[in-house]
């Protein structure tokens, strides 16, 4: 390895701040638009209020100082954390004040979770359904009850205490946000010291975070859950601190506790295998992962992250330098490789954010898929509404993050990219062969679209003609997903073979036996067939189109053959000015706008597939003799192979619960279903009409106001083209999300 040159020697880390850089002035903040000279003058037209909202958090437009932008972002993060703690506090408070948590804890299979009781004002107390145990309330599907049980919370008092703790943390975060902007604001070099930042986040946030959670799981969750699992009532379980200070109490449950730390220091770690296990599979009592497995997992992660937090070179001259690692990365086809990327990532927060959003979005989608295959908390697997809600939620979060990655990648290209500093490096070479990338991606989209859709069209046609023997199906022309089935089989065979210490498979989705809790299926092998093969290629198609739109937007955000000077027009512009027809929807912003619709397409197909597949092939009841009867009786394999099947046997058949919900505790979902359709339809008014139409209409209305001498002082203006599109896509997605939410929950709460 090359010795670092003098330029690359790591600067010593020191905490450097500016004292009292910005006054705390309520007078200034009280003036709307104080952050912009133009907006601070006040409104002349109605466009002002739109620009106020668009630019309030666009720190780039408020100052050209990277240090000042960094400080604003840093301070805003504390504000975000304050909101999160406030929200957490509210959740715990609802659990303490309005929920049936303790009743649920004593009978989790017979009582449904509820944390909201609707007050009777105009008859809406109809929403308080009977959730069992004599409690009337709204059934909740957030998974909080299961998480609280896994944490070892057994009383409302503990929930109250945590809620108060959350409020305290929120106040602390608000103070920190103010303090680090107005009193002691970090200098730019502090924000740019990536080695120190990586060390602290890896060791502190992830390492100590995992260690703390592992400690909590070992000392509190495990003993309390062991007692709950064996039927001890929550009221009889000792208080949490008893388990911390009374070693004899712990030793009764986990004998190795009587040996203390001797096995640890004598490296005889196997002694601790009574509470740090490697069982695999699910706890047959709760249908969740073994808590001793998850404690072991978090302890192992803590060790890894604490080690990783000592990996980067700061004040001691040992360890990695991020710049050196990046610049050493040179492949045979990548020219100067990663040269210049360090400078990009330390001076462009948009570039940094784009990568982080892509990673976090992908991670959220991975979480969605793990949470049903390996249900992490006790009794969550048999709470079907919660399982469906959490899958849908994490898919949506992931989708928005991934599109956000495309957005900020384009903003980086327009605002922060410097061609002179990126000659022949990886980014430059990607941009130079963008035509090949985009045209290949386009070909893939066309291929996937026509072939996957073509399979469905073929099946619909054959079924219409009564030629079922000529259809693609498990009973005619089979298209089995052989690679997926092979992956399932190697995971099923792993325990005792390639995973010699595991007692059971990582997930029963791969194979194995049916795990049932309270006569309901928690998890069982998911058989994959022709219907899955077909819909998976629809997933591939919609995801690739989303990627095509976002990647094209990013690669062509500075210039294109059509508009060579795009970078001068900015991130969002409606078209290339008068006299240039056919240049609409080419800005980076417009690609994000279009990408959002395809993201919605992708996720709708994915969550519909999940919802139907689980109801058809996994979720259901188990008879005393062990027979499983699924909610929709296994109709997925034969119905999901035609478009008509999706429309008739999924959308229409399963919408009956939401459509017929009036007069029942689920009637709110019927109203939401209706209202969200309305919001969605409202969006089309913005998406399908031009600005001129509205400007003409407004001028007539203003004329009428002038006629009767009630003309407004602020001149009304139609929305700009971009504003109209923004309002349109926002209502389109909101309407779509609301409709899907009501459709899913009314259905699954009724039948699940």
From Swiss-Prot:
Pfam families: PsaA_PsaB. PROSITE patterns: PHOTOSYSTEM_I_PSAAB. Its EC number is 1.97.1.12. The chain crosses the membrane at residues 73-96, 159-182, 198-222, 294-312, 349-372, 388-414, 436-458, 533-551, 591-612, 666-688, 726-746. Phylloquinone binds at residue 694. PsaA and PsaB bind P700, the primary electron donor of photosystem I (PSI), as well as the electron acceptors A0, A1 and FX. PSI is a plastocyanin/cytochrome c6-ferredoxin oxidoreductase, converting photonic excitation into a charge separation, which transfers an electron from the donor P700 chlorophyll pair to the spectroscopically characterized acceptors A0, A1, FX, FA and FB in turn. Oxidized P700 is reduced on the lumenal side of the thylakoid membrane by plastocyanin or cytochrome c6. This is Photosystem I P700 chlorophyll a apoprotein A1. The lineage of its organism: Eukaryota, Rhodophyta, Bangiophyceae, Bangiales, Bangiaceae.
């Amino acid at each position: 390895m090359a010795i670092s040159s003098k330029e690359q020697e790591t600067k010593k880390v020191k905490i450097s701040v500016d004292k009292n850089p910005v006054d705390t002035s309520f007078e200034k903040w009280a003036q709307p638009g104080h952050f912009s000279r133009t907006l601070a003058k006040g409104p002349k037209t109605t466009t002002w209020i739109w620009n106020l909202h668009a630019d309030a958090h666009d720190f780039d437009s408020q100052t050209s100082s990277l240090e000042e932008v960094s400080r604003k972002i840093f301070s805003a993060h504390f504000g975000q954390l304050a909101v999160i703690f406030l929200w957490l506090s509210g959740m715990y408070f609802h659990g303490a004040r309005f929920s049936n948590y303790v009743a649920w804890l004593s009978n989790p299979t017979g009582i449904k979770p509820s944390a909201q009781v609707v007050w009777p004002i105009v008859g809406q107390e109809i929403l308080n359904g009977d959730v069992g145990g004599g409690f009337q309330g709204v059934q909740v599907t957030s998974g909080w009850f299961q998480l609280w049980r896994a944490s070892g919370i057994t009383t409302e008092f503990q929930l109250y205490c945590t809620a108060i703790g959350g409020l305290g943390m929120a106040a602390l975060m608000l103070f920190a946000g103010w303090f680090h902007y107005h009193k002691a604001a970090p200098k730019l070099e502090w924000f740019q010291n990536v080695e120190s930042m990586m060390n602290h986040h890896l060791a502190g946030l992830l390492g100590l975070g995992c260690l703390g959670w592992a400690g909590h799981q070992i000392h509190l969750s495990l003993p309390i859950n062991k007692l709950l699992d064996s039927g001890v009532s929550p009221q009889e379980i000792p208080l949490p601190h008893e388990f911390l200070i009374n070693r004899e109490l712990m030793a009764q449950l986990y004998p190795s506790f009587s040996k203390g730390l001797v096995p640890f220091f004598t490296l005889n770690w196997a002694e601790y295998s009574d509470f740090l296990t490697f069982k695999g599979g699910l706890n047959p009592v709760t249908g969740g992962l073994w808590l001793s497995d998850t404690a072991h997992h978090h302890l192992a992660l803590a060790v890894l992250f604490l080690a990783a937090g000592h990996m980067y070179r700061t004040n001691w001259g040992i360890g990695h330098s991020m710049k050196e690692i990046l610049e050493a990365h040179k492949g045979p086809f990548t020219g100067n490789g990663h040269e210049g990327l360090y400078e990009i990532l330390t001076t462009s927060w948009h570039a940094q954010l784009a990568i982080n959003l892509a990673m976090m979005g992908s991670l959220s989608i991975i979480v969605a898929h793990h949470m049903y295959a390996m249900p992490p908390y006790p009794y969550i697997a048999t709470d079907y509404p919660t399982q469906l809600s959490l899958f849908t939620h994490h898919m949506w979060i992931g989708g928005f993050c991934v599109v956000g990655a495309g957005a900020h990648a384009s903003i980086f290209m327009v605002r922060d990219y410097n061609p002179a500093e990126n000659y022949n490096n990886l980014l430059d070479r990607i941009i130079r062969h963008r035509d090949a990338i985009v045209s290949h991606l386009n070909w893939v989209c066309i291929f996937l679209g026509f072939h996957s859709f073509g399979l469905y069209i073929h099946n619909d046609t054959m079924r219409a003609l009564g030629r079922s023997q000529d259809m693609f199906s498990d009973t005619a022309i089979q298209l089995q997903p052989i690679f997926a089935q092979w992956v399932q089989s190697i995971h099923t065979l792993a325990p005792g073979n390639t995973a010699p210490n595991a007692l059971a498979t990582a997930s029963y989705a791969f194979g194995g036996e049916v795990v049932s809790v309270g006569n309901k299926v928690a998890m069982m092998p998911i058989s994959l067939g022709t219907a899955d093969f077909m819909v998976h290629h629809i997933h591939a198609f919609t995801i690739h189109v989303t990627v095509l739109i976002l990647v094209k937007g990013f690669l062509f955000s500075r210039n294109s053959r059509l508009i060579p000077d795009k970078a001068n027009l900015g991130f969002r512009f409606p078209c290339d000015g008068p006299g240039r027809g056919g240049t609409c929807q080419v800005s980076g912003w417009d690609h994000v706008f279009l990408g959002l619709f395809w993201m919605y397409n992708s996720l709708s197909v994915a969550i519909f597939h999940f919802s139907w597949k689980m109801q058809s092939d996994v979720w259901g009841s188990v008879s005393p003799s062990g027979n499983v009867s699924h909610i929709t009786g296994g109709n997925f394999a034969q119905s999901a192979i035609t478009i008509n099947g999706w429309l008739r046997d999924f959308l229409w058949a399963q919408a009956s619960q939401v459509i017929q919900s009036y007069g029942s505790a689920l009637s709110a979902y019927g109203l939401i279903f209706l209202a969200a359709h309305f919001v969605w339809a409202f969006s089309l008014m913005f998406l399908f009409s031009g600005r001129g139409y509205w400007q003409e209409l407004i001028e007539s209305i203003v004329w009428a106001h002038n006629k009767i001498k009630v003309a407004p002082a602020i001149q009304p203006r139609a929305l700009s083209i971009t504003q109209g599109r923004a309002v349109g896509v926002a209502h389109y997605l909101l309407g779509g999300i609301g409709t899907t939410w009501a459709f899913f929950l009314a259905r699954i709460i009724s039948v699940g």
